[in-house]
Amino acid sequence: MNEPAMNRSEGRAIFGLDASDYDIARMGYPAQLYDAIAARTGGSLAGRSVFEIGPGTGLVTRELLARGVERLVAVESDPELARLLSALAGGGDRLHVVNAPFEDADLGVDRFDVACAAASFHWLDTAPSLAKVHAALVPDGTLALWWNSYRNPHHGDLFAAAVLPLMAGLSFPPFQSAESHGSHDERFWRGELIRAGFGSIDHELVRAERTLTTAEVRALFGSYSFIRRLDREARERLLDAIALLAEREFGGVVPNVALTASYLCTAGPR
């Protein structure tokens, strides 16, 4: 979808370098998404066993714990993020953090009711990772994949369109480019899920509009892996240019279109 693409192993190691700033100016996920997952498990996540791929700073982890999951295995490849996750309040004996790449992670012998991956599955090799997920779920278990995208120039996002020239020459994560986000490619994800043995696939795209300050825009772009990977001088130069654009062209009142793309599906017969 884009070239050149960031190396997957590089991308996985970036976010733990500055975990405290990752969530600044990023949104949570719609409550209706968690409700939809719960609906597939009898109406509630309470008492369910769940594993989460790439929990990062624990945004989804905290919500799952709050909804009463009985067992939550969080598979996080970054050592610093794994350390922070282990200290999450309310986890107790219900939360077990596995610090390993998902491909190498030992999920144990007990199968799970639900698997979740929020803004992380693009860092994995799709086909073998889906196969591992399928094998780890109980029959008719639920897989939920979802992403937030904040640069949507083809969905009425004026600032995302205006900033495109500044994105030239950058290397983006797998399934992303300066103009598009791979989570919107419904045909691709449906095909991969079907080939991996999943069915009853529901796809939803939820739109949210908000206004950001210049400081929030700078923080948002500064949280992107394709900008974090730059050397300090190049990174600051680019972020300065983005902030200048926000001030000069938008008066520091920057429109932002955020899209949440989700795929919920059921593990079919093995």
Which residue stretches match the model-derived regions?
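Class I SAM-dependent methyltransferase Rossmann-like catalytic core
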Residues: 16-27
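Conserved alpha-helix/loop element of class I SAM-dependent methyltransferases that forms part
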Residues: 28-47
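Class I SAM-dependent methyltransferase SAM/SAH-binding core
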Residues: 51, 57-105
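A short acidic, Gly/Pro-enriched loop at the edge of an enzyme's catalytic core
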Residues: 105-115
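Short catalytic micro-motifs in class I SAM-dependent methyltransferases
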Residues: 119
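A short, conserved alpha-helix within the catalytic core of class I
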Residues: 124-133
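Conserved catalytic/acceptor-binding region of the Class I
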Residues: 134, 138-208
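Conserved Class I S-adenosyl-L-methionine
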Residues: 183-270
